[in-house]
Amino acid sequence: MLNIAVDLLWLRPKKVGGTEFYIRNLLDGFLQLEEPFRLWLLVSKDNKETFRHYTQDKRIELLETEVVSANIAGRILWNFFCQNRFLRKKGIRKCFIPVYCRPLFNGGIAYVNVIHDLQAAHYPEYHPFHEIAYSRLCWWLDAHFSRHLVAISDWVRNDVKEKYHVKSGKITTIYNPITVDKEELVSFEQLAEKYHVAENEFYYTVAQLIPHKNLHTLIAVMERIKNTDVGLPCRLLISGVNGESRDKLESQIRNRGLEREVTLTGFVENAERNALYKYCRAFLFSSVFEGFGMPPIEAMLFGTTVIATDRACVPEVTQGKANYVKDPYDVEEWIRVMQNPADRIAEMDFAQYDQMKLTRKYFELLRKYLE
């Protein structure tokens, strides 16, 4: 029987973007499995209550630590030097870590890690030196000491194989499970009152406010629409957890006189996000680097036109069925694509992101390498 720890100490609720949705979707999938298993969720003082409800299933228990996830440096040190001993004392010898971070040594514990991307390797200019050093160390440890690796797209798998010389048999691609409840919606009247938008007369995007999401280009697109007669709605809503670019984006919005046209909504709950997906003219995905990219697929599940960059994994995970901008920084190209988007959503195979299909892939992989 599968009997493993699941390291969740890295998760700072509503602070880590898509990785939080990924692991919660996966854990929700485990609840629906009929097979026997035992998951010990390794949780921190400041995230444990967000996982408490999983213990209603007798197959899942919390392993509470003294770690504070918000104290990133403290969490890393505990992860490096204390985690193995903690697990051994609990009689646990196998651990699944759904991100790249891990202890310095195995210490008698078998680990399976998930690598979501190698962002700091591709865009070091967006990260301080200590983040780059830590990321590269963990990726090297994953490649050399973890029993097996999961990549969240073929693009990431190939990237890891190339940069860390990982053999094909040691890394498996499993897409992120995507769950969208199409009935979980606030009314459009609520959106209209809150954001002063008209149905099908605004654009929407979901992205963490960090540089490689390329949101400054979308703001420039809105400025061009406002100042020229291109026949497009001049209204953009941007949802996502705060990041280092928030101040710069707010300044850009003010300096261009777009306070009425561009709104940073901050984090929004699923019901509001879903309604924004459904009622927008199109979903714009300007990111230049992604390991997977869940928001475009979520938008397409609502039948919404998606306009995205063709960088990294985005064409792969959208199955080539979105509308693509070849130069993600070219304002004029964005406008041209926005003026004449194609609708190929009916050709999408959404079963590739099915929660239970992918949960079962994880279950079988973890049984193979950790049972």
Each language-model region and where it sits:
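Carbohydrate transferase catalytic cores enriched for Leloir-type hexosyltransferases
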Residues: 1-371
